[in-house]
Amino acid sequence: MLSKSHIQLLSHLLGTTDSELSVTSLADALDWSPGHTSRIVSELKGWGCIRTETRGRQKIVSLTDIEPIEELEELTTEYSHVDFPEVIAGSGLQILYYLDHSRTATEIAEHSSVSRATVYRRLDDLQQVGIVGKSTSRYQLNDPFTTLSSIARGLYHHRHRREAQRHTGKINIQWETHDEYLFTCGSDIEADGFYLTGPGLFEAFDIPLLTRDQRYYIRSNRLSDVTPADLICHTLLIDDGPRYRTYCLLLMEKQAVEASALQERAAHYQPEAALDVRALVDELIEYLETGGEARTDHLPEWEAFKRT
């Protein structure tokens, strides 16, 4: 997560008239040690917020032009009285991530992995400075601070891209939360926390498929491996067309995937999905349970499926 020091350094760069500053100058301006400043600079570079260049014996730091930095600059310029390092730092960024629309404190705690007590405390702080409002039991960002959620999401998105691109080339993120993301790339990845998924993993469950050169990976600290239930959800997130739905049906039948386990995994992926994963999963479950009688246009005829 981004600490108060990270946001303080960003705020200083946003507020200065110099587009480039040395690490030494930053350390002096912020009254930090050179070692602490170098560490914060390195970590912000990993988030995609800044770039560095070595000139002689000096490391020069400048802001990148990613959208969340531009949005943060607009807010800090117009609302200079707000202590944004205090607002955004630590768990604040995770909480803001899930204020893209109104949510209860319980929902925010569940999605953000921040304790409920901390969520309530941070939301109370945000209410006191007018950034967050509350209607019944639901919290939402007040105008003009709605971009704070966009900033949080943008920062995590760029961090995910940079992390994945350290192990491969061009990527396309299909689904993400603040701490997990599903993406496609063109090469194999062998790194801790990255798990092969999608069509390329079906062979591991005795369903060999003709796949394209693309690879799909899930980056997660939650998983120790990709279960059949996870794989089904990932596949639907990648492509919910008839062919991929049939792949999922084959896997469900071959591995005797329990309906409850699949529904539980679908509920995990649903909040940040661009499609209704739970409804799709229920549709597949009902199709198999009824022997194809409960069939939609996107599912095969039962006899055709049994011949697959």
Task: Pin down the residues of each PLM region.
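Short amphipathic alpha-helical interaction segments
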Residues: 31-45, 113-128
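Short, Lys/Arg-rich nucleic-acid/phosphate-binding segment
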Residues: 54-60, 66-67, 135-146
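Short helix-coil-helix linker/hinge
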Residues: 1-9, 85-93
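A short, conserved structural fragment
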Residues: 45-55, 127-137
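Hydrophobic alpha-helical interaction segments
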Residues: 213-308
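Short, amphipathic alpha-helical interaction segments positioned at domain boundaries
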Residues: 68-92, 144-179
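Short capping segments at the starts of secondary-structure elements
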Residues: 16-22, 99-107
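Short gly/ser-rich loop at a beta-strand->alpha-helix junction or flexible surface loop bordering the NTP-binding
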Residues: 158-231
